[in-house]
Design a protein with these regions (language model features):
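Short edge-strand/loop segments of extracellular domains
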Residues: 59-63
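Short coil-to-beta transition motif at edge beta-strands of beta-rich domains
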Residues: 32-44
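Short coil-to-beta-strand transition motifs
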Residues: 46-57
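Acidic/polar N-terminal loop/beta-strand segments that form early-domain functional surfaces
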Residues: 11-12, 43-45
Length: 132
């Protein structure tokens, strides 16, 4: 299997969006081969439907056991197993609606896109489209 250059991660709750941006951390149970340097595109429900709201580059991957007790309790509550720490996170000025991207042809929506692996050319095309 070819390794991914990055992934799509969906931020499921509106209140978690600011938490991700403020802490540069994303807690997940998604069983992927996370690696330092991978790019993650953030997807969230917006007024336009599902839309890309930004992206980040992974700096570190922490197991639940490496986290603070408070973080471990939150992980237990939500079933998360890892924390992705980002080197930086960029918020798009305007969300990029999924239906305006090449990914619309996949016929996937919402949680079905969570954890979807992407190659570098797909990542770059989506980021360029969102920032363009």
């Amino acid at each position: 299997m070819v390794e991914a250059d990055g992934y799509i991660l969906r931020i499921a709750k509106k209140e978690w969006i600011e938490k991700v941006y403020n802490s540069a951390m994303y807690y997940t149970s998604s069983p992927r081969k996370w690696q330092k340097g991978q790019t993650v595109l953030f997807l969230a429900k917006t007024e336009f439907g599902d839309a890309f709201i930004g992206y980040g580059v992974i700096e570190n991957i922490h197991s639940k056991e490496e986290l603070s007790q408070e973080e471990q309790r939150e992980c237990d509550t939500w079933g998360w197993r890892k924390a992705l720490e980002f080197k930086y996170i960029i918020r798009f000025n305007k969300p990029l609606a999924l239906k305006e991207t090449s990914l619309k042809d996949l016929g996937l929506r919402g949680k079905c896109l969570h954890g979807l692996p992407l190659k570098a050319d797909q990542l770059n095309a989506l980021i360029d489209q969102a920032e363009g």
